[in-house]
Amino acid sequence: MEKDKILFVTQEIIPYLPENKISHIGRYLPQGMQERDCEIRTFMPRFGNINERRNQLHEVIRLSGMNMVINNTDHPLIIKVASIQSARMQVYFIDNDDFFKRKFTLTDDKGHLFPDNDERCIFYARGVLETVKKLRWAPDLIHCHGWFSALVPLYVKKAFKEDPIFDHAKIVFSIYDQAFEGTLNKDFIKKIPIDDITTKDIKLIENPTYNNLIKLAIQYSDAVVLGDEHIHSEIIDYLNQKQLPFIYHPNEENYIEAYNNFYDSL
């Protein structure tokens, strides 16, 4: 496929958060595709442990201000941006005082999931897509990284399926070894629907476990990347059942080219 415009939706990017596999890919894959003459946009959450002053984040007033209703509560969408000068690359941040003020990412200081991670996940996915619409920038390919971006494929394929910004976009979802214990909020399935989405479309997460959330992302994606060696067999079995194109994350030396070729094959 033509891949002139690629939207990257990730949950971690260095240098804003500590380095791990997902934050490393989130940083260098967009740069690699930009160096191959693709136009890119990159998004991540503005978690409260990101140092705004050191990283020179600033609000983009023209993109901020929308209210998103989740579980009958209004949540203002704030958009911030920062530049990675060495890569000539901008990163957009989805922010909101209710969801991203705390000085942690997805778990508290005891390692427990935040009870509102379900609503944070919804806000992030919808916030990214609404911002891309405001930018009037139609991606050819959307590459999502990590479970916090897992609702993006659903919203693109169901809620925004007739929107000219998204109606031709292919979706790639990258899965990493980042399973969480327990479940998200039991009412998650009731909070997700907007527009044409019904609870039938998201039946997979009646029990909102990590594996079921990843399976929902696979259900609405066009292709998958297995970003770690250790992915639960239940997820692998579901991926094989759906018969989607997939690749294992290639080695460090040539992964940009491997992703480039994979994008071309879709």
Language-model segments: which ranges?
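Catalytic cores of nucleotide-sugar-dependent glycosyltransferases that transfer UDP/GDP/TDP-activated
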Residues: 1-266
